[in-house]
Swiss-Prot record:
Family matches, as HAMAP family: ThiC (MF_00089)
Pathway(s): Cofactor biosynthesis; thiamine diphosphate biosynthesis
Gene3D superfamilies: 6.10.250.620, Radical SAM ThiC family, central domain
Family stated for the protein in its record: Belongs to the ThiC family.
Entry protein name: Phosphomethylpyrimidine synthase
Known EC number: 4.1.99.17
Annotated GO CC locations: cytosol
Length: 631
């Protein structure tokens, strides 16, 4: 943690400098590779970690080495991870999916924006300095057409997005030849079906069944296709966004790029402060990952923060505004029903979801049913026209472990299952949001309830936090629950940062939250038995046993921290080749001793073998050649 706290002016200047000097860059000793597909224009980016060779013998003067294979890994950084690509935040990213969208012939450009709010913002000359200069002309489905990946999947169509995902999910493991690296323990998948090889047809089938979603708004062509579903790699979401008291457009774009660098599969923009519309445009035009929002936050800003003044018309206009900007998924709190609100009265911590509390207050003040529930079919019609996925929000999630798994939480979950089937009628993709604060012994029930009542739609949870006693360390308390529920079948984990319950996260907090959750997601993939998940672990263990320090750093989720911790006590270059670390020193290193034991055992085997051969030679009378019948 920095000893000197930066002023707001300094924070903005630092963020601006980051944006102005941004270049594509790879992690240490890594390079960007692309795997091509059968469909034209499908090139899937991955990061390949280059490893040093293993010393296997020879002399000091003429050592003998054995090459180690490069390790391919999933890469969320988009163009920011490719040193060959010129980055210009002012222009935004290349529109990767635009040719695929255009080739389908089922969309049309809008001559005028559908949202009154968007029209007003575009007409305001005072916003010119804040506005992203290359605003896209939005597209919408042609009349009578649906443009969702779910619709295509149900029609039996394998889209370029699906083929891209199939290659990406396999993580290039077909390139690995070493049996040591390919070894993997059997997993326990709790009913998930994990194929040995993920094909584009498998992706299509999972999407068609509603078990997976591909968040890919037709107005966000910059995004690289990814999938959320329990039969795929567990994904991680990072939250960013300004508030009424802090953060700027520059800082939010910086956090976006930073998030994708550290492994965010999706990013949610939860801005609640000024210039929400403009901030979101900058984020979308520069995001290689899907972007989600909670539209009720901006709708509330439009009525000056007074929940009672919210209307369906204001909310509908907000949906159109965001859909035409390119938001890939909406969190909609349509399951907070009027009759469920009294169920929270005896809770220790009441309703802790911002969206849930807004809708609960509206329901009570008007004594009417939630207008999101009442107008849900109209919401689905909007989503179907742009391919916006729905993330059905858990507005009644528990905010403390005392309130976990209560009547209100599961009543809402069952309603979300009802809404899922309605959304599917419109070919709208759906995932379900989950808690929250849940002690370990109560976590699995959340997964089984969701699978049963929400028809196996992907589950997306915030943690859950497994204890409430650790403010400042809630990335740990929730990472434990995240690993567990990911193992049980949760498809995406929403990260928690060290600032949870305390304040708005900065760059370092974002990184800490993401690393914690990438660990949780990877641990879940290992436990489920996702094919190829153990390759990187095996490569790390091999490098560790062989004292290949540089490879250990480079294989780490965070190479920079691994190197820094090592160099705190052994900063010299000789420390990078030493057969010990500062924990045990040269005399007590268990791995060094293990190597010596292995070498000794091998030598003993040779010596015993030679003795046996000598005895056998003497027993045959010392003859060099044997007759054929004796051989």
């Amino acid at each position: 943690m920095s000893a000197t706290k930066l002023t707001r002016r300094e924070q903005r200047a630092q963020a601006q400098h980051f944006i102005d000097t941004l270049e594509g860059s790879a992690f240490p000793n890594s390079k960007r590779i692309y795997i091509t597909a059968t469909q034209p224009g499908v090139r899937v980016p991955m990061r390949e970690i280059q490893l040093s060779p293993t010393l296997i013998g020879g002399s000091k003067e003429q050592p003998q080495y054995e090459e180690n294979e490069a390790i391919p890994v999933y890469d969320t950084s988009g163009p920011y991870g490719d040193p060959q690509i010129a980055i210009n935040v002012q222009q935004g990213l290349a529109k990767l999916r635009q040719p695929w969208i255009d080739a389908r012939g089922d969309t049309e450009e809008l001559t005028v924006r559908s949202s009154d709010y968007t029209k007003a913002r575009l007409a305001d000359d005072g916003l010119d300095e804040l506005r992203f200069s290359g605003v896209l002309t939005p597209k919408r489905a042609k009349a009578g057409r649906r443009v969702t990946q779910l619709h295509y999947a149900r029609q039996g169509i394998i889209t370029p997005e699906m083929e891209f995902i199939a290659i990406r999910e396999n993580m290039g493991r077909e390139r690995i030849r070493s049996e040591v690296l390919r070894h993997q323990h059997p997993g326990m998948s709790f009913g998930a079906r994990l194929p040995e090889n993920i094909t584009a047809e498998f992706v299509r089938d999972e999407v068609a069944a509603g078990r997976a979603i591909i968040p890919a708004n037709i107005n966000h062509p910059e995004s690289e296709p990814m999938i959320i579903g329990r039969n795929f790699l567990v994904k991680v979401n990072a939250n960013i966004g300004n508030s009424a008291v802090t953060s700027s457009i520059e800082e939010e774009v910086e956090k976006l790029v930073w998030s994708t660098r550290w492994g965010a599969d999706t990013v949610m923009d939860l801005s609640t402060g000024r210039y929400i519309h403009e901030t979101r445009e900058w984020i979308l035009r520069n995001s290689p990952v899907p972007i989600g929002t909670v539209p009720i936050y901006q709708a509330l800003e439009k009525v000056n923060g007074i929940a009672e003044d919210l209307t369906w018309e204001v909310f509908r206009d907000t949906l159109l505004e965001q859909a035409e900007q390119g938001v890939d998924y909406f969190t909609i709190h349509a399951g907070v029903l009027l009759r469920y609100v009294p169920m929270t009265a005896k809770r220790l911590t009441g309703i802790v979801s911002r969206g849930g509390s807004i809708m609960a207050k509206w329901c009570l003040s008007h004594h009417q049913e939630n207008f999101l529930y009442q107008h849900f079919r109209e919401i689905c019609e909007i989503c179907a026209a742009y391919d916006v996925s729905l993330s059905l929000g858990d507005g009644l999630r528990p905010g403390s472990i005392q309130d976990a798994n209560d009547e209100a939480q599961f009543a809402e979950l069952h309603t979300l299952g009802e809404l899922t089937k309605i959304a599917w009628e419109y070919d709208v993709q759906v995932m379900i949001e989950g808690p929250g604060h849940v002690p370990m012994q109560m976590i699995r029930r959340n997964m089984t309830e969701e699978l049963e009542h929400c028809h196996e739609a992907p589950f997306y949870t915030l943690g859950p936090l497994t204890t409430d006693i650790a403010p400042g360390y809630d990335h740990f308390t929730s990472g434990i629950g995240a690993a567990m529920i990911g193992w049980f079948g949760c498809a995406m984990l929403c990260y928690v940062t060290p600032k949870e319950h305390l304040g708005l996260p900065n760059k370092e907090d974002v990184k800490q939250g993401l690393i914690t959750y990438k660990i949780a997601a990877h641990a879940a993939d290992l436990a489920k038995g996702h094919p190829g998940a153990q390759i990187r672990d095996n490569a790390m263990s091999k490098a560790r046993f062989e004292f290949r320090w540089e490879d250990q750093f480079n294989l780490a989720l965070d190479p920079f921290t691994a190197r820094a911790y090592h160099d705190e006590t052994l900063p010299q270059e000789s420390g990078k080749v030493a057969h010990f670390c500062s924990m045990c020193g040269p005399k007590f290193c268990s791995m060094k001793i293990s190597q010596e034991v292995r070498d000794y055992a091998a030598a003993q085997t040779i010596e015993v073998g030679m003795a046996d051969m000598s005895e056998n030679f003497r027993a045959r009378g010392g003859e060099i050649y044997l007759r054929k019948e004796e051989a």
